[in-house]
Amino acid sequence: MQRSSACLVLEGVSRHFGGLKAVDNVNLTLQPGARHALIGPNGAGKTTLFNVISGELRADAGTITLNGADVTRLAAHQRAARGIARTFQITKLFPNLTVLENMLVACEALDRRKFTMHRPLSSCPDLVERATNLLDEFRLSPFRQELARSLSYGDQRKLEVALSMAGRPRVLLLDEPMAGLSSVERDAMQALLRKLDSSIAVLLIEHDIDVAFGFAERITVLYQGRVLTEGPKEVVSADRSVQESYLGLLVE
């Protein structure tokens, strides 16, 4: 795959915990606008890989390149400023702030201006406009003045994805955004994900094979920290090693 135009490139990325090779020599390339799924059984290293990409964990080996720049040693907030955003398996919101306030905080986080008690976020029209537009996009406007903790779980998951879009990311990491959702909520989330900006590269962790293969154009299968196979979804689904090690015996 061509790397000169790639927005994210992992080369030989590893992360070990003592003798456990949680992520082992992983190579991955995302082009702008990619829709890519990362699948594998529990314990395969998927979330650990996300943590390494986003800077929550440091790589023990290998390099991570974002938009042509080496970000391997940068902290998470520095990578976020350069265009990486993510969601988590467990929703991370400010439960005692309103939906709009959550959105404003996310929009301000990557803004260069400094805000104080004497200059509240709501006093900045462009931030309010950005926050309001995102709430509209994710169909959360009716709840803008409600506390985040009062939202249904499905709407909390939607809010987290909306928050991840606040900084206009180039690469978006979605860690099981449909986990724990009802069938109706899953359908709504899938519809929203299909409408994400087509210029953003999206890497999705998803246990539901139908969802993963329905969303992504390319699939990477991770098994025991290593890439078992990677390629177009039609090729991966027909791969016998994938059928035996994941889609068959080890699917959970």
Where are the model-predicted features located?
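Glycine-rich phosphate-binding loops of nucleotide-dependent enzymes
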Residues: 2-252
